């Protein structure tokens, strides 16, 4: 968390504070891709080239075919669409080593810096 704290382009997608706690089965960040020279898809590709597999966080329900056919429209949910376009799920698992965590963090920070 401290590596992305107060970053101008990267934000934590989920803030845990007070009496709340998390199992941390996912680690999510939000990146303002409008401030970068590369798209989210290109960002994914660059991470993959560095052997970091990230994922699109959950696709909003109205974007699923079934709900689209029912008339749900993402234009009515601009915040959900923005969150979807900015949020990445990063590797997080029990045996993740500190060195691997550091590599993921440094790679993300470097990619953002190179593409501002």
What is the predicted function of each stretch?
Residues 1-116:
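PLP-dependent aminotransferase class I/II
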